[in-house]
Amino acid sequence: MFHARLIFCSFALILLSTSVNAQKTSFKVMAWNILHGGNDIENGPENVAKIIKEINPDVILMVETYGSGPFIADYLGYNFHLIASEETPLNDTSVNLSIYSKYPFGKRIDTKFPFYLGGIEISINGQTIRFFSNWFHYLPWDNEPEKMRKSVEELLEWEKTESRHKMIQKVLPYLKKFANETDSIPMIFGGDMNSLSHLDWTKKTKKIHNNLVVPWNATEILDDLGLIDSYRKENPNPITHPGVTWDKKGRKDSHRIDYIFYKGKSIKSTKSNSYNAFFNEPIIINGKEIIYPSDHGIVVTSFKLR
């Protein structure tokens, strides 16, 4: 009898150890543009926090924070990093980007362009990872670029005509620098790129894009740096898993424009999902109905430390 109990206890300890190790090596990242700090609906910041609570990410890469960060962080019990100069008040309503974490923060990663790129190092069970929150301008934009009567070459030139391409060129040196250091310190880059993906405009999808295969510059640049689009890696078929994060009621304007990219020998994605609902309408997560405060969908990717 004693021997049987000893075997059972040993087995239970093995299971517990396995569970703890799984927790130590796995983490979940969320990227979300919350739209004007969530303030465009009644109790919006609270609804933002409730949605995050149901998804339960370990790290959040947030866009359009605009003063709501401290409330959301306090509500959820996360560490909070505002992507702005150190002396900036955490509730500054002009600051766009932020990062939340259940894990301790390390070194700041400041850029000359904090409105559209910045980051911080986070230590996850002994592994330092560089996290970046990002926003790029929405122009140029067309709801249905496949109907613009442009060739692939003309579309690529059109894509470079306004603010988004200029922003990308400004932050590209930072991205190159950190991408080149990922053998020792991996990086995760996420947010609202306001850009279509070259991985969604392929030969497999040309029938829904007026027979066009378009290597969109914004995402192709990241691909060239070796960054992996986590959602498309885990959901390789754009037809069955479009991953829409931008959709407008009453018109054809459904696109995937929010992303989580990563690079590094010591991390890999294991699962990626998207969540979406129309602004000011209900979203149901884990059986709970919450009024959706944003016009952007959510990307959530699970990672594992190698």
List where the protein language model places each region:
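Structural recognition of the beta-strand scaffold that forms the well-ordered cores
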Residues: 28-31, 59-63, 98-99, 130-133, ...
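Metal-dependent phosphoester-hydrolase catalytic domains
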Residues: 110-111, 177-187, 195-306
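N-terminal, active-site-proximal structural segment of metallo-dependent hydrolase catalytic domains
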Residues: 2-6, 20-75, 89, 93-94, ...
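Active-site environment of divalent metal-dependent phosphoester hydrolases
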Residues: 37-39, 66-71, 92, 139-142, ...
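Structured beta-strand-rich core segments of catalytic domains in phosphoester-bond hydrolases
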Residues: 59-145
